[in-house]
Amino acid sequence: MGVTVDLEVVTPEKLILSETVQLVTVPGSEGYFGVLSGHVPMISSLRSGVVRMGQGDDAVHLAVSKGFAEVRPDRVTLLVDRAVFGKKVDAAAVTKIRDAAQDELDGTPTESEEYETLRDKLDFANAQLAALEGELV
């Protein structure tokens, strides 16, 4: 067994990332979890958050929307609706989107489908800003 895992991040449009990493931290729906080589196989739902590849100053951060993760001992596959590298985030544009979503959300009934759509937009905007700063949300 090696000391690395193959990581793939896939959206409906394209393969965003295919890398070999030593450690990946993933935003599971029940909280963040780390994956090293030899991890027990599992499937998890994902929430919007930040995928961190590596550790310390060399870490790469990727904002992802909700989706699913398949973990195997030597491979992690993330299927998400959207993904953006932290270094490519336009902070001003994302902040504007976040603020608009928050304003709309404040007047929307929590049981509505519109509320869920706005909540997803807000969560992904927050994930993008966190990825830009190299933080987990």
Swiss-Prot record:
Alphabetic keyword roster: ATP synthesis, Cell inner membrane, Cell membrane, CF(1), Hydrogen ion transport, Ion transport, Membrane, Transport
Location within or outside the cell: Cell inner membrane
Keyword Mitochondrion: no
Annotated GO CC locations: plasma membrane; proton-transporting ATP synthase complex
HAMAP family, alphabetized: ATP_synth_epsil_bac
Pfam families: ATP-synt_DE_N
Topology with respect to the bilayer: Peripheral membrane protein
Record protein name field: ATP synthase epsilon chain
Recorded GO MF terms: ATP binding; proton-transporting ATP synthase activity, rotational mechanism
Subunit comment: F-type ATPases have 2 components, CF(1) - the catalytic core - and CF(0) - the membrane proton channel. CF(1) has five subunits: alpha(3), beta(3), gamma(1), delta(1), epsilon(1). CF(0) has three main subunits: a, b and c.
Family membership: Belongs to the ATPase epsilon chain family.
Name of the gene encoding the protein in the UniProt record: atpC
Function: Produces ATP from ADP in the presence of a proton gradient across the membrane.
Domain of life of the native organism: Bacteria
